[in-house]
Amino acid sequence: MAGDYAVPMLSPTKLLIIGGAEDRVGKAKILKRFVKLAGGKASTIVIIPTASSFQAEVIASYSEVFTRHGCKTLDVINPADRIAADDPALANRINAATGVFMSGGNQLKLAQVFAGTAAGEAIRRAHQRGAVIGGTSAGASIMSEFMISLGDEGVTPRQRSTQLSQGLALLEGVIVDQHFAQRQRYGRLMSIVASSPNLIGIGIDEDTAIEVTDNESFTVIGRGAAYVLDCRRAITDAPEARSGAPLLVSGAVVHSLPAGSTFDLTKLVLTEFVEQHPDSGITVTVAASSRP
């Protein structure tokens, strides 16, 4: 019941968007960061395994790693369908969370169950009040307003190579793709942003995450890189190209951002790069030159 769950108020807003296949058994740097953002020993974390075909294993795995890194209070929310996701009791449990984590799996299933339901709206409210929302693979894609639910792989952008579904719109004006380099998803993300230049594409490698603060900037953590695709001023034949044809895209701006990069989502520029050299242990900070 609503009265059974105190609603914690936190600040600033945080998203932890993971490109999939993150380390869970070693140092688990990304998931450790998620627990810290959720409040560490004071955290209340809700796990949502709905996208996965191996839900028992997913629940056990994330429960173990979150507990290992300090979380004392865990809950699991796993509605079978949209009717179940509209249950106010589920929304109340999300209201009590300081962190919500969505697993990987079938992103179309995740969208069909949560987008536009009471549970989905509760996740949006949790983000707005400052609870950290984390997601990996499918759980990463659903954070944007529109998400890639199906799509071809490969480095060449092709016309109509993807299918979009409604996401949770936690990060508006952006479309997220995951397993980016490992599954060669550059082409499909570029085709979307070339066809919809109002959207900025963000691709994230495996065992890599972006930590988004107040929907204004993000910092990259993990073993790989994140990529920002900006086609606002690109030339493209997307309106005329036949289905499946390679797209003309000229003048797109692509940022390749390894761990330690901080990127401004409002100005679409790199603001800082912090690199720790493994041999010397010296940390080098490079402040990017500002541009109008």
Which role fits each region the language model picked out?
Residues 102-104, 123-147:
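Catalytic nucleophile loop
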Residues 2-41, 53-61, 66-68, 147-149, ...:
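C-terminal and late-domain segments of enzyme folds
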Residues 107-117:
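Glycine/threonine-rich flexible loop motifs
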Residues 17, 75-77, 101-102, 133-136, ...:
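General beta-strand structural signal in soluble alpha/beta enzymes
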Residues 46, 52-97, 102, 109:
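Portal/gating segments that form or line small-molecule/metal binding sites
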